[in-house]
Amino acid sequence: MAFPPRRRLRLGPRGLPLLLSGLLLPLCRAFNLDVDSPAEYSGPEGSYFGFAVDFFVPSASSRMFLLVGAPKANTTQPGIVEGGQVLKCDWSSTRRCQPIEFDATGNRDYAKDDPLEFKSHQWFGASVRSKQDKILACAPLYHWRTEMKQEREPVGTCFLQDGTKTVEYAPCRSQDIDADGQGFCQGGFSIDFTKADRVLLGGPGSFYWQGQLISDQVAEIVSKYDPNVYSIKYNNQLATRTAQAIFDDSYLGYSVAVGDFNGDGIDDFVSGVPRAARTLGMVYIYDGKNMSSLYNFTGEQMAAYFGFSVAATDINGDDYADVFIGAPLFMDRGSDGKLQEVGQVSVSLQRASGDFQTTKLNGFEVFARFGSAIAPLGDLDQDGFNDIAIAAPYGGEDKKGIVYIFNGRSTGLNAVPSQILEGQWAARSMPPSFGYSMKGATDIDKNGYPDLIVGAFGVDRAILYRARPVITVNAGLEVYPSILNQDNKTCSLPGTALKVSCFNVRFCLKADGKGVLPRKLNFQVELLLDKLKQKGAIRRALFLYSRSPSHSKNMTISRGGLMQCEELIAYLRDESEFRDKLTPITIFMEYRLDYRTAADTTGLQPILNQFTPANISRQAHILLDCGEDNVCKPKLEVSVDSDQKKIYIGDDNPLTLIVKAQNQGEGAYEAELIVSIPLQADFIGVVRNNEALARLSCAFKTENQTRQVVCDLGNPMKAGTQLLAGLRFSVHQQSEMDTSVKFDLQIQSSNLFDKVSPVVSHKVDLAVLAAVEIRGVSSPDHVFLPIPNWEHKENPETEEDVGPVVQHIYELRNNGPSSFSKAMLHLQWPYKYNNNTLLYILHYDIDGPMNCTSDMEINPLRIKISSLQTTEKNDTVAGQGERDHLITKRDLALSEGDIHTLGCGVAQCLKIVCQVGRLDRGKSAILYVKSLLWTETFMNKENQNHSYSLKSSASFNVIEFPYKNLPIEDITNSTLVTTNVTWGIQPAPMPVPVWVIILAVLAGLLLLAVLVFVMYRMGFFKRVRPPQEEQEREQLQPHENGEGNSET
């Protein structure tokens, strides 16, 4: 029994997690697997063609093939349904696949109708491996039964083809039957070959699904084969044995791989055990000589299926095999903190001491099953380190599947994939499962680079991706002189006598690569001067002979030859043609391979090494008047003041900033004043009507959501420069939480050192100013008694039964500029005097954000309210004086002693309290109180022949503003509205005398006659015609005289 471990390695917190964000994926560039024209192979529909794949490289043949398992394919075996096949596909242009005949027979019987084995649905081809002339293919669901038992047992079987010999290999078809033995072994669930020509077979169902590994020599399998013997014993067999019950349902043999882990030169056995350790999962490494335990690895998350896939390869070039373990159901917490299934691959790097250092790669998509398959690729790009492929067969667009290519390096696996292969086939009845099976590390086209097969059994496909030869380019670029003196003009522009300052540009290429590559490589080289200048901007340097900032050149390089160079002359434009003298001039070189001419006979094109940049740049500097070091160091300063100390919220506040900018150091190039303005301010312009202020050129712009005013201060802003300028703003969009507005000012330049001034902030405080007024009016303002035809009624029902309508209107108006959010309005109404009613309130209305309540019942007698109103509710108070009253005034000679004033100091008053909501600038809230003059009171004998002044009063106080952090003063005021009641006779209007009317008409007629005479004397009534041709006059004249006819 080989289960007890020699050393257990738990993949816990000591590992170094490499958690990759999906944001890194767009950075992955396609490297050297050819994704543009892969070779695609297809099998019978529904056969699961592609469930297992491998290369087949017979040693005695120059041809190379692909092996593809189709475990649900039908065969020619008599009486067998979906027996399964392994197909051999020619990788060349024909791409034909032919089934390999391993077994042409049907089920064998003990006797007629007494079968020994059951080959239907046996899934032959579910696992396939090859080594030189040898092919091992298995059917893990093959069933058989002993003569004494009737139950079918899925022991599994395999067929081994060695050259021309084909033998059956069924190590689990033994006398150790039933579930406690090898009856449910499913031998061949996973398989592999060792370097020493041993086969390694996994049977995860043996011993109550503890699982089992079995290894036998190829030579002994072939030599001992006897078709008449069902259970063959092998002398040199290595196998794990049954263990304690605690190991039941572990699935040893679920996945297998081989590699040397103890340094004895013999391949050891690696197996995934995904349900071991209470479903944490384990991976066992057994000694390839005696099946003793070497190392164990334990997963860290239950049910992650740690060990679903395993692989072994030296990824970091230290000659020690490293272990890769897939856990496709691993769950990780997303950005929202919730667990989600992403899959994980553990990478355990073997050290010289036999220890392992483990890092982890998490998947990039949810439910993609990252780590379902892992395939060593060999040295895919020939950089000296092996590479590896990891599949996420249900990832990508529409779950078509993804395969990630990771490159090895000296420190281990590069955590960012260098290439991503995506499935291109839509799902049928099931997902395509692109990447569920993979095999690499074989150079099928013999170009010196290993290739990769990817299976997609859900669409019955297998895809061959060939590796493209990698070309490494060494590029050189030299600029001299690197300091350009504008005054040193030693070159002449061709065709002119104009002298210019020039410099040399020298560029070189060298190319080499491994594998099959052409001897000559063609490149297109692009040179660009002043690369960093944006498109459309003036480039400060041009090539001398083309007068262009760019240059193209085709260069043919000998592979592996010496560096090949060429040289060009460039010149500097005149300084009057550009502003930027400080920024270095970047000379940029880019090269591209002519892939078409570099392709091989099959059309496969090489590729440039992605780890070598395809461009190079150098810089040249313009000589400046900045001392010996050619480095200008300005000393920039800015100060600011404003013409306003306070800004009132809600007002259109004009604000002028007086800015002083100065440079006390060396020249500042492309100097600009940057004013960051708050959201509450808008830039109006520069003050230009003051001779003491500089008229700067300024513009408004938005950069990174920051609103700025940018003003040009000169190029350069010379030493000792002082500028005073005025900038005008309008501040009018303050929020309710603001207490001030802030402007940030800074001078910026393009200098390398001391390029900016300190930021200066200028704050202007905000203040609240609300001019709130209250005004009122009475309609009518005068009532004359007695009322014609009025009769007293004991129980009045209508308005006419009581008396005339009297309405008081109060308007609370905010003239701003600031708003208020709440105010209280208090109205006192003269209601009774000596128990006699004065003004009987029928109802009150409001217009605006206001709610009112009264301390007494309104209209307790339920007097019917007339639909005809003497005044309109929506009339403004200001318009009341312009309306004609129903009762007109007359001049009365009344002394103060004749008027009795009845206000709240004398009469009993009704109170109405109103809460007024928010009023912005220019808004009003209006209260309309409609009442009836209680005529009966004033018709009493003791009250007759007296005049009365009935006064209501209203007062308000603002109690709340929307501005939370600003000091606010109390705002209050009041007003009175008076209705006069007078005894007397209303004067009738005087009629206009008839003689006045006649005189007015005569005067009008006389004026009209004078106007007509004056206009006649001035020729106003004479008709003026434009000049006419003689013929036209002749035609028109008869008509003018009235003597013409109708003929023309």
Curated annotation (Swiss-Prot):
Signal peptide (UniProt feature, chain positions): 1-30
Function: The alpha-V (ITGAV) integrins are receptors for vitronectin, cytotactin, fibronectin, fibrinogen, laminin, matrix metalloproteinase-2, osteopontin, osteomodulin, prothrombin, thrombospondin and vWF. They recognize the sequence R-G-D in a wide array of ligands. ITGAV:ITGB3 binds to fractalkine (CX3CL1) and may act as its coreceptor in CX3CR1-dependent fractalkine signaling. ITGAV:ITGB3 binds to NRG1 (via EGF domain) and this binding is essential for NRG1-ERBB signaling. ITGAV:ITGB3 binds to FGF1 and this binding is essential for FGF1 signaling.
Membrane topology according to the record: Single-pass type I membrane protein
Paired cysteines (S-S): 89-97, 138-158, 172-185, 491-502, 508-565, 626-632, 698-711, 852-914, 904-909
Homology family: Belongs to the integrin alpha chain family.
Cited InterPro entries: FG-GAP, Int_alpha_beta-p, Integrin_alpha, Integrin_alpha_C_CS, Integrin_alpha_Ig-like_1, Integrin_alpha_Ig-like_2, Integrin_alpha_Ig-like_3, Integrin_alpha_N
Residues at which Ca(2+) 3 binds: 379, 381, 383, 385, 387
MF terms (GO), sorted A to Z: coreceptor activity; extracellular matrix binding; extracellular matrix protein binding; fibronectin binding; integrin binding; metal ion binding; opsonin binding; protease binding
Transmembrane segments: 993-1016
Sequence segments annotated as region (Disordered): 1027-1048
FG-GAP repeats: 32-98, 109-170, 173-225, 237-291, 292-357, 358-415, 419-482
Glycosylation sites: 74, 290, 296, 488, 554, 615, 704, 835, 851, 874, 945, 973, 980
Motif (GFFKR motif): 1019-1023
Protein name: Integrin alpha-V
Complexes and interactors: Heterodimer of an alpha and a beta subunit. The alpha subunit is composed of a heavy and a light chain linked by a disulfide bond. Alpha-V (ITGAV) associates with either beta-1 (ITGB1), beta-3 (ITGB3), beta-5 (ITGB5), beta-6 (ITGB6) or beta-8 (ITGB8). Interacts with CIB1. Interacts with RAB25. Integrins ITGAV:ITGB3 and ITGAV:ITGB5 interact with FBLN5 (via N-terminus). ITGAV:ITGB3 and ITGAV:ITGB5 interact with CCN3. ITGAV:ITGB3 interacts with ADGRA2. ITGAV:ITGB3 interacts with FGF2; it is likely that FGF2 can simultaneously bind ITGAV:ITGB3 and FGF receptors. ITGAV:ITGB3 interacts with IL1B.
Segments in the Cytoplasmic topological domain: 1017-1048
Extracellular side: 31-992
Compositional bias annotation for Basic and acidic residues: 1027-1042
Species of provenance: Homo sapiens
